A protein has these predicted regions:
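Short beta-strand-to-turn element immediately C-terminal to the catalytic PLP-Schiff-base lysine
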Residues: 133, 162-167, 205-207, 273
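Short acidic-hydrophobic, aromatic-tinged amphipathic segments that line or gate anion-handling sites
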Residues: 51-59, 130-135, 163-165
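A conserved helix-loop-beta module that forms one wall/lid of the active-site cleft
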Residues: 94-161
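ATP-dependent carboxylate/phosphate-activation module, predominantly the ATP-grasp catalytic core
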Residues: 193-199, 203-261, 272, 280, ...
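ATP-grasp fold ATP-binding core
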Residues: 120, 143-164, 183-197, 202, ...
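ATP-binding N-terminal substructure of ATP-dependent carboxylate-amine bond-forming enzymes
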Residues: 1-105, 315-318
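Peripheral (often C-terminal) accessory segments that flank ATP-dependent C-N-forming ligase machineries
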Residues: 4-5, 122, 139, 307-326
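Conserved ATP-binding module of the ATP-grasp superfamily
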Residues: 126-130, 148-151, 164-197, 201, ...
Length: 326
Protein backbone atom coordinates (compact mmCIF):
# COMPACT_ATOMS: atom_id res chain seq x y z
CA UNK A 1 0.00 0.00 0.00
CA UNK A 2 1.17 3.50 -0.86
CA UNK A 3 0.18 6.20 1.62
CA UNK A 4 0.57 9.97 1.39
CA UNK A 5 0.61 11.40 4.91
CA UNK A 6 0.08 15.12 5.50
CA UNK A 7 1.40 16.49 8.80
CA UNK A 8 0.47 20.13 9.31
CA UNK A 9 3.01 22.40 11.09
CA UNK A 10 1.35 22.46 14.53
CA UNK A 11 0.73 18.71 14.73
CA UNK A 12 2.33 16.59 17.44
CA UNK A 13 0.62 13.36 16.34
CA UNK A 14 2.96 10.42 16.86
CA UNK A 15 2.81 9.10 13.31
CA UNK A 16 6.20 7.29 13.48
CA UNK A 17 4.97 5.12 16.36
CA UNK A 18 1.64 4.42 14.67
CA UNK A 19 3.36 3.49 11.40
CA UNK A 20 5.72 1.12 13.23
CA UNK A 21 2.75 -0.56 14.91
CA UNK A 22 0.97 -1.33 11.63
CA UNK A 23 3.63 -1.65 8.93
CA UNK A 24 3.91 -5.44 9.31
CA UNK A 25 0.20 -5.77 8.50
CA UNK A 26 0.99 -4.90 4.88
CA UNK A 27 3.05 -6.93 2.41
CA UNK A 28 4.58 -3.68 1.28
CA UNK A 29 3.95 -0.28 2.87
CA UNK A 30 5.37 2.88 1.34
CA UNK A 31 4.65 6.17 3.09
CA UNK A 32 5.47 9.59 1.73
CA UNK A 33 5.19 12.53 4.16
CA UNK A 34 4.12 16.03 3.10
CA UNK A 35 4.92 18.63 5.74
CA UNK A 36 6.36 22.08 6.44
CA UNK A 37 9.92 23.16 7.18
CA UNK A 38 8.66 25.17 10.17
CA UNK A 39 6.76 22.27 11.75
CA UNK A 40 6.67 21.89 15.52
CA UNK A 41 7.65 18.20 15.56
CA UNK A 42 10.63 16.75 13.68
CA UNK A 43 10.43 12.96 13.53
CA UNK A 44 12.76 10.04 12.98
CA UNK A 45 10.69 8.01 10.58
CA UNK A 46 10.56 4.19 10.32
CA UNK A 47 11.88 2.44 7.23
CA UNK A 48 8.50 2.36 5.47
CA UNK A 49 8.62 6.15 5.12
CA UNK A 50 10.42 6.52 1.82
CA UNK A 51 10.49 10.31 1.57
CA UNK A 52 9.68 13.46 3.53
CA UNK A 53 8.77 16.49 1.43
CA UNK A 54 8.89 19.95 3.00
CA UNK A 55 7.25 23.16 1.81
CA UNK A 56 7.91 26.65 3.15
CA UNK A 57 4.29 27.77 3.49
CA UNK A 58 2.00 24.82 4.22
CA UNK A 59 -1.25 26.72 3.60
CA UNK A 60 -0.23 28.47 0.38
CA UNK A 61 -1.52 27.91 -3.13
CA UNK A 62 1.97 26.82 -4.17
CA UNK A 63 1.96 24.16 -1.44
CA UNK A 64 -1.43 22.91 -2.66
CA UNK A 65 -0.11 22.75 -6.23
CA UNK A 66 2.92 20.82 -4.98
CA UNK A 67 0.60 18.45 -3.09
CA UNK A 68 -1.46 17.73 -6.23
CA UNK A 69 1.73 17.11 -8.21
CA UNK A 70 2.89 14.59 -5.59
CA UNK A 71 -0.46 12.79 -5.76
CA UNK A 72 -0.26 12.68 -9.56
CA UNK A 73 3.24 11.20 -9.56
CA UNK A 74 3.21 9.02 -6.41
CA UNK A 75 -0.27 7.60 -7.05
CA UNK A 76 -1.11 6.83 -3.39
CA UNK A 77 -3.73 4.28 -2.42
CA UNK A 78 -4.71 6.40 0.59
CA UNK A 79 -4.21 9.99 1.74
CA UNK A 80 -4.14 10.70 5.48
CA UNK A 81 -4.56 14.07 7.17
CA UNK A 82 -6.19 15.35 10.35
CA UNK A 83 -6.02 19.11 9.74
CA UNK A 84 -8.94 21.41 8.94
CA UNK A 85 -6.92 23.24 6.31
CA UNK A 86 -6.25 19.95 4.50
CA UNK A 87 -9.85 18.74 4.39
CA UNK A 88 -10.84 20.26 1.07
CA UNK A 89 -7.62 19.85 -0.91
CA UNK A 90 -7.23 16.23 0.20
CA UNK A 91 -10.86 15.47 -0.68
CA UNK A 92 -10.43 17.16 -4.06
CA UNK A 93 -7.36 15.01 -4.74
CA UNK A 94 -9.27 11.86 -3.80
CA UNK A 95 -12.12 12.79 -6.14
CA UNK A 96 -9.75 13.80 -8.95
CA UNK A 97 -7.55 10.70 -8.80
CA UNK A 98 -10.10 8.08 -7.67
CA UNK A 99 -8.69 7.53 -4.17
CA UNK A 100 -10.98 6.15 -1.41
CA UNK A 101 -11.93 8.35 1.53
CA UNK A 102 -13.88 11.55 2.10
CA UNK A 103 -14.74 13.06 -1.28
CA UNK A 104 -15.13 16.65 -2.46
CA UNK A 105 -18.92 17.09 -2.18
CA UNK A 106 -19.23 16.21 1.50
CA UNK A 107 -15.89 17.85 2.33
CA UNK A 108 -17.26 21.11 0.94
CA UNK A 109 -20.22 20.83 3.32
CA UNK A 110 -17.73 20.48 6.18
CA UNK A 111 -15.72 23.58 5.17
CA UNK A 112 -17.93 26.18 3.47
CA UNK A 113 -20.31 27.41 6.17
CA UNK A 114 -23.04 28.40 3.68
CA UNK A 115 -23.03 24.98 2.00
CA UNK A 116 -22.90 23.49 5.50
CA UNK A 117 -26.09 25.30 6.56
CA UNK A 118 -27.95 23.98 3.53
CA UNK A 119 -26.75 20.44 4.26
CA UNK A 120 -28.11 20.70 7.80
CA UNK A 121 -31.44 21.98 6.47
CA UNK A 122 -31.57 19.11 3.99
CA UNK A 123 -31.02 16.74 6.93
CA UNK A 124 -34.09 18.18 8.67
CA UNK A 125 -32.16 20.04 11.37
CA UNK A 126 -33.01 23.49 12.66
CA UNK A 127 -30.38 26.11 11.84
CA UNK A 128 -29.54 29.64 12.95
CA UNK A 129 -31.00 32.14 10.44
CA UNK A 130 -28.30 33.35 8.06
CA UNK A 131 -27.70 35.25 4.85
CA UNK A 132 -24.84 35.75 2.42
CA UNK A 133 -22.58 38.79 2.58
CA UNK A 134 -21.27 40.36 -0.61
CA UNK A 135 -20.95 43.95 0.57
CA UNK A 136 -21.68 46.43 3.32
CA UNK A 137 -25.25 46.76 2.09
CA UNK A 138 -25.91 43.17 3.13
CA UNK A 139 -24.60 43.87 6.62
CA UNK A 140 -26.75 46.99 6.96
CA UNK A 141 -29.82 45.08 5.76
CA UNK A 142 -29.16 42.31 8.29
CA UNK A 143 -29.90 44.77 11.11
CA UNK A 144 -33.41 45.13 9.72
CA UNK A 145 -33.91 41.43 10.54
CA UNK A 146 -31.81 40.85 13.64
CA UNK A 147 -30.90 42.89 16.70
CA UNK A 148 -27.35 41.50 16.86
CA UNK A 149 -25.48 40.29 13.77
CA UNK A 150 -22.61 37.81 13.69
CA UNK A 151 -20.12 38.15 10.83
CA UNK A 152 -18.36 34.85 10.16
CA UNK A 153 -15.69 33.70 7.70
CA UNK A 154 -17.20 31.19 5.28
CA UNK A 155 -14.03 29.10 5.36
CA UNK A 156 -13.00 29.74 8.95
CA UNK A 157 -11.98 27.16 11.54
CA UNK A 158 -13.43 27.28 15.03
CA UNK A 159 -14.17 30.75 16.37
CA UNK A 160 -11.28 32.53 14.65
CA UNK A 161 -12.17 35.68 12.70
CA UNK A 162 -15.74 35.98 14.00
CA UNK A 163 -17.07 39.49 14.68
CA UNK A 164 -20.20 40.28 16.69
CA UNK A 165 -21.91 43.48 15.52
CA UNK A 166 -24.28 45.11 18.01
CA UNK A 167 -25.42 47.96 15.76
CA UNK A 168 -24.77 49.67 12.45
CA UNK A 169 -22.47 52.02 14.36
CA UNK A 170 -19.89 49.21 14.49
CA UNK A 171 -19.44 49.27 10.72
CA UNK A 172 -17.49 52.53 10.07
CA UNK A 173 -14.47 51.27 12.04
CA UNK A 174 -14.45 48.00 10.08
CA UNK A 175 -14.67 49.92 6.80
CA UNK A 176 -11.20 51.39 7.46
CA UNK A 177 -9.52 47.98 7.39
CA UNK A 178 -8.30 47.01 3.88
CA UNK A 179 -8.23 43.26 4.56
CA UNK A 180 -11.79 43.35 5.90
CA UNK A 181 -13.01 45.26 2.83
CA UNK A 182 -11.30 42.80 0.52
CA UNK A 183 -12.85 39.82 2.29
CA UNK A 184 -16.35 41.33 2.29
CA UNK A 185 -16.20 42.16 -1.41
CA UNK A 186 -14.86 38.70 -2.34
CA UNK A 187 -17.70 36.82 -0.62
CA UNK A 188 -15.48 35.47 2.18
CA UNK A 189 -18.05 36.15 4.92
CA UNK A 190 -21.62 35.27 5.73
CA UNK A 191 -24.02 36.72 8.30
CA UNK A 192 -26.16 35.04 10.90
CA UNK A 193 -28.39 36.03 13.79
CA UNK A 194 -26.72 36.04 17.19
CA UNK A 195 -27.80 33.03 19.25
CA UNK A 196 -27.45 33.53 22.99
CA UNK A 197 -28.14 29.96 24.10
CA UNK A 198 -25.79 27.39 25.59
CA UNK A 199 -23.34 25.79 23.17
CA UNK A 200 -22.80 22.03 22.87
CA UNK A 201 -20.33 19.96 20.90
CA UNK A 202 -20.71 16.41 19.64
CA UNK A 203 -17.57 14.47 18.82
CA UNK A 204 -17.72 11.49 16.51
CA UNK A 205 -15.54 8.56 15.52
CA UNK A 206 -17.24 6.82 12.59
CA UNK A 207 -16.14 3.19 12.35
CA UNK A 208 -19.02 1.87 10.26
CA UNK A 209 -22.80 2.29 10.07
CA UNK A 210 -23.30 -0.02 13.04
CA UNK A 211 -20.46 1.28 15.19
CA UNK A 212 -20.27 5.02 15.80
CA UNK A 213 -18.80 6.76 18.83
CA UNK A 214 -20.97 9.83 19.50
CA UNK A 215 -20.02 11.91 22.54
CA UNK A 216 -22.17 15.00 23.35
CA UNK A 217 -20.77 17.67 25.70
CA UNK A 218 -21.68 21.17 26.87
CA UNK A 219 -19.19 24.01 26.71
CA UNK A 220 -18.63 25.72 30.06
CA UNK A 221 -17.56 28.88 28.23
CA UNK A 222 -18.95 29.83 24.79
CA UNK A 223 -16.38 29.16 22.01
CA UNK A 224 -16.59 32.83 20.96
CA UNK A 225 -14.87 33.72 24.25
CA UNK A 226 -11.83 31.53 23.63
CA UNK A 227 -9.50 34.56 23.54
CA UNK A 228 -10.83 35.93 26.85
CA UNK A 229 -11.32 32.83 28.99
CA UNK A 230 -10.05 29.28 29.28
CA UNK A 231 -12.55 27.12 27.46
CA UNK A 232 -13.69 23.74 28.70
CA UNK A 233 -16.63 21.39 28.51
CA UNK A 234 -18.39 18.64 30.41
CA UNK A 235 -19.69 15.39 28.93
CA UNK A 236 -23.44 14.97 29.24
CA UNK A 237 -25.13 12.35 31.40
CA UNK A 238 -25.88 9.38 29.15
CA UNK A 239 -29.29 9.05 30.81
CA UNK A 240 -30.22 12.69 30.26
CA UNK A 241 -32.68 14.11 27.73
CA UNK A 242 -30.09 16.43 26.16
CA UNK A 243 -27.73 13.51 25.57
CA UNK A 244 -30.47 11.49 23.87
CA UNK A 245 -31.58 14.38 21.69
CA UNK A 246 -28.07 15.25 20.51
CA UNK A 247 -27.45 11.58 19.81
CA UNK A 248 -30.61 11.47 17.69
CA UNK A 249 -29.79 14.67 15.79
CA UNK A 250 -26.23 13.55 15.08
CA UNK A 251 -27.40 10.19 13.72
CA UNK A 252 -29.99 12.02 11.62
CA UNK A 253 -27.29 14.28 10.18
CA UNK A 254 -24.94 11.40 9.40
CA UNK A 255 -27.78 9.40 7.81
CA UNK A 256 -28.44 12.32 5.46
CA UNK A 257 -25.01 11.83 3.88
CA UNK A 258 -26.50 8.76 2.18
CA UNK A 259 -23.92 6.79 0.20
CA UNK A 260 -21.11 9.30 0.59
CA UNK A 261 -17.97 8.31 2.50
CA UNK A 262 -18.42 9.57 6.06
CA UNK A 263 -15.52 11.47 7.71
CA UNK A 264 -13.60 9.23 10.12
CA UNK A 265 -13.85 11.85 12.85
CA UNK A 266 -16.22 14.80 13.18
CA UNK A 267 -16.76 17.76 15.49
CA UNK A 268 -20.31 19.18 15.44
CA UNK A 269 -21.70 22.15 17.37
CA UNK A 270 -25.27 22.83 18.42
CA UNK A 271 -26.93 25.71 20.27
CA UNK A 272 -29.74 25.23 22.74
CA UNK A 273 -32.11 28.14 22.22
CA UNK A 274 -34.50 29.86 24.62
CA UNK A 275 -37.28 27.38 23.84
CA UNK A 276 -35.04 24.40 24.65
CA UNK A 277 -34.59 23.28 21.05
CA UNK A 278 -31.20 22.27 19.68
CA UNK A 279 -30.14 24.29 16.66
CA UNK A 280 -27.32 23.21 14.34
CA UNK A 281 -24.28 25.47 14.42
CA UNK A 282 -21.38 23.96 12.49
CA UNK A 283 -19.69 20.68 11.60
CA UNK A 284 -16.11 19.84 10.77
CA UNK A 285 -14.38 16.77 9.35
CA UNK A 286 -11.73 16.83 12.07
CA UNK A 287 -11.40 16.33 15.80
CA UNK A 288 -12.37 19.06 18.25
CA UNK A 289 -9.79 21.50 19.56
CA UNK A 290 -8.65 22.31 23.08
CA UNK A 291 -8.60 19.27 25.36
CA UNK A 292 -11.50 17.47 23.69
CA UNK A 293 -9.14 14.82 22.29
CA UNK A 294 -7.82 14.13 25.79
CA UNK A 295 -11.36 14.00 27.23
CA UNK A 296 -12.38 11.33 24.72
CA UNK A 297 -9.21 9.35 25.35
CA UNK A 298 -9.90 9.35 29.09
CA UNK A 299 -13.58 8.45 28.72
CA UNK A 300 -13.46 5.97 25.84
CA UNK A 301 -9.82 4.96 25.48
CA UNK A 302 -9.83 6.20 21.88
CA UNK A 303 -7.31 8.67 20.46
CA UNK A 304 -9.23 10.46 17.70
CA UNK A 305 -6.07 11.30 15.76
CA UNK A 306 -4.83 7.71 15.82
CA UNK A 307 -8.32 6.42 15.02
CA UNK A 308 -8.45 8.69 11.97
CA UNK A 309 -5.07 7.35 10.82
CA UNK A 310 -6.09 3.71 11.26
CA UNK A 311 -9.55 4.14 9.75
CA UNK A 312 -8.10 5.78 6.65
CA UNK A 313 -6.03 2.63 6.17
CA UNK A 314 -8.97 0.33 6.94
CA UNK A 315 -7.41 -1.02 10.13
CA UNK A 316 -9.97 -0.34 12.87
CA UNK A 317 -12.16 -3.32 13.68
CA UNK A 318 -15.92 -3.10 14.04
CA UNK A 319 -15.73 -4.11 17.71
CA UNK A 320 -13.64 -1.05 18.69
CA UNK A 321 -14.75 0.36 22.04
CA UNK A 322 -17.46 3.03 21.82
CA UNK A 323 -18.68 2.71 25.42
CA UNK A 324 -17.80 5.37 27.97
CA UNK A 325 -15.85 4.06 30.95
CA UNK A 326 -17.39 4.60 34.39
Amino acid sequence: MKVLLLQQPKSFSNYPKWIEEIQERFDCLEVMVFTSNDRAAHHSWPSSVIKEIEVSDYSSDSATAKFFDIVRKFKPDRIVSSSEEDVLRVAEARSLFGIPGLQHELALSCRDKVTMKQSALDAGLKIIPYTTCQGFGDIISAFDRWETVVLKPRWGAGSAGITILHSKDDLPALATKPEFIRNVHSNQYYLEEYCSGSVYHVDVVYINSGSILISPSRYLVPPLDFEKQNTGSVMLDENGADYSELLRLTKQLIASFNDQTIPNVMHIEFYKNETGDFVFGEMAARRGGGLIKQELAAAYGIDQSKANFLLELGLVDADANITRSS
